[in-house]
């Protein structure tokens, strides 16, 4: 209905104004929770309603048409941006060890024994940041935000 009367740019603006703002609010805290799956289904439902397609249609191409990231990608992007903008809070492996290691430029992950920390956004963010190629890690924060 909305898509038939408005241009694609306006539909995207409506999505960002009404849904995306609520979707991304505090996502680094709740994005890894079991209820995030329900929110992702809701996001896909909104996209399908905007394009007036049936519920069995895949949303992958619709996300690409709208240039919108799906919820899991938004979560990963926000966590990586959080780690990049807060690098001063973390230490690299080179600062922890007195000898040189292969992963000396990676951020040090604190050893833990609880699954609570294992599911936290800090642990997940550090692991994801360490996986990034070094050319992305070396970018300034604002350029990093654009590349991610």
Question: Model features per residue range: what roles?
Answer:
Residues 1-148:
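Hydrophobic/basic alpha-helical segments
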């Amino acid at each position: 209905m909305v898509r038939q009367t408005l241009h694609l740019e306006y539909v995207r603006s409506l999505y960002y104004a009404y849904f995306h703002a609520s979707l991304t609010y505090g996502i680094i805290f709740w994005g890894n929770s079991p209820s995030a799956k329900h929110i992702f289904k809701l996001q896909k439902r909104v996209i399908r309603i905007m394009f007036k397609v049936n519920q069995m249609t895949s949303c992958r191409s619709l996300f690409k048409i709208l240039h919108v990231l799906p919820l899991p990608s938004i979560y990963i992007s926000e966590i990586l941006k959080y780690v990049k903008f807060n690098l001063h809070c973390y230490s690299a492996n080179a600062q922890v060890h007195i000898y040189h290691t292969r992963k000396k430029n990676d951020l040090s992950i604190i050893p833990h024994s609880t699954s609570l920390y294992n599911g936290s956004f800090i642990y997940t963010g550090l692991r994801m940041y360490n996986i990034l190629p070094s050319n992305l890690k070396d970018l300034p924060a604002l350029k990093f935000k654009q590349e991610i």
